[in-house]
Amino acid sequence: MDEFHRCGKEDSFWQQCFLYPLFFKEDLYAISHDHYLDVSSSSRPMEHLSSNDQLSFLTVKRLIGQIRKQNHSIVLFVNCDPNPLADRKKSSYSESVLEALTLVLEVPFSIWSKYSVEGMNESKSFRSIHSIFPFLEDKFPHSNSILDARIPYSIHPEILVRTFRRWIRDAPSLHPLRSVLYEYRNSTENLQRSIIVVPRVNTRFFLFLWNYYVCECESILFSRLKRSSHSRSLSHGSFPQRTHFHRKIKHIIIFSRRNSLKSIWSLKDPKIHYVRYGERPIIAIKGAHLLVKKCRYYLLIFRQFYFHLWSEPYRVCSHQLSKNCSSSPGYFLRVRMNPILVRTKMLDELFIADLITDEIDPIVPIVPIIGLLATEKFCDISGRPISKLSWTSLTDDDILDRFDQIWRNLFHYYSGSFDRDGLYRIKYILSLSCAKTLACKHKSTIRVVRKELGPELFKKSFSKEREFDSLRFSSKAAARSQRERIWHSDIPQINPLANSWQKIQDLKIENLFDQ
């Protein structure tokens, strides 16, 4: 990729117009093959490794020919192989083709990203879930309604190929992409589906496909939006590999249903906020109920006319924004606005001004979290811990890891709250539920389990908590350190409890529209 960047710096126009010859460079597939071996060797035992893992470019050309002929005897998309030793060689060539295809398609996007980022020094990349809090500080004082939507995760392969034409001028280079997408759609696991479903597979090809698709949805919808100058937001023109979390906007594009996409006008409102976490974009609006209905209506029309998708009405729902509770990132978060007096003065105390502003004060919502824990069978409705019977068939390490993951994500998310008494109550529920689960598995008692495990129970989470506390109270000013908040930003994935809550909310919305 670095070599492609150097070539693109000299002549980026050539790279955009003539990408197809890159598919026939042997070194491209050699790099992809070596990358696959490096990744797969880390997950394979040493006795399975072979010194004969050499790449045959002739075999790669034959495989590409089979893909172009839509030969369904080949297997490019397999989640699990029943016999990895027998199919490892075949799988390595398939992965090399997908890796090489992704590298070629990334060339124009990488060049465009570098030039666009160099001209935008003010752009900042938010890679953490906790970039949601600057959004909350702007949203709560100025918004009264919210649109909760879901990005369509299914799309026809031909529509996806046509969207690539907006960035790639070399039409022949899109033929392999079209063949691969149709091959995936016609594979055994997707035989009954007429549209491609973007999966959550941690491969370079699917990650690039998903990032490009999300960026395309946002860039087209918000191509003429203007950001507020004082916003701490990410520039809209960033590479799709960067996750867009927060963007404050001034205008929203409206598409007329009567004239399809020919008539476009702007609806100006200085208090429209946009944020996305995963596949769930959220638009916070301050305005009349009619404005909210129009935004929801035009969002559905935009998807229907541009992506040729019929979006169910419940995929874009609107509701009044609560002033003391939010669940937009997939977590619950209670807040209260504390007024703060800010005094400013010039030199020699010539001028003094007192400004009153609001400070967001996050609170751990203990009641909703206990309700979710009760739904997932960690405790009863009153908060008394119970054993997780469905996990008793797992090993002790798996049980500890699952409880550790839930507690670590909850602690990292709510560790910046001023009042963490509710967080420690949740820790007590999870730790006792873990002990009861282990006791139920071994047909023993909690006392015996605690005696055997001792400090090993939640050892990883407790060590992170101690690091956090030592970091907080290492300041010289003890009084000020008690008011400091440090938000952790290393959450690798969303909490399973948040997914459970989101499913409950989706079912409620679907039932509401079915009535």
UniProtKB/Swiss-Prot annotation:
Its main location: plastid. This is Maturase K. Coiled coil: none annotated. Transmembrane segments: none annotated. The keyword Lyase does not apply. Usually encoded in the trnK tRNA gene intron. Probably assists in splicing its own and other chloroplast group II introns. InterPro entries: Domain_X, Maturase_MatK, Maturase_MatK_N. GO terms for biological process: mRNA processing; RNA splicing; tRNA processing. It is found in: Plastid, Chloroplast. The lineage of its organism: Eukaryota, Viridiplantae, Streptophyta, Embryophyta, Tracheophyta. GO terms for cellular component: chloroplast. Belongs to the intron maturase 2 family. MatK subfamily. Keywords: Chloroplast, mRNA processing, Plastid, RNA-binding, tRNA processing.
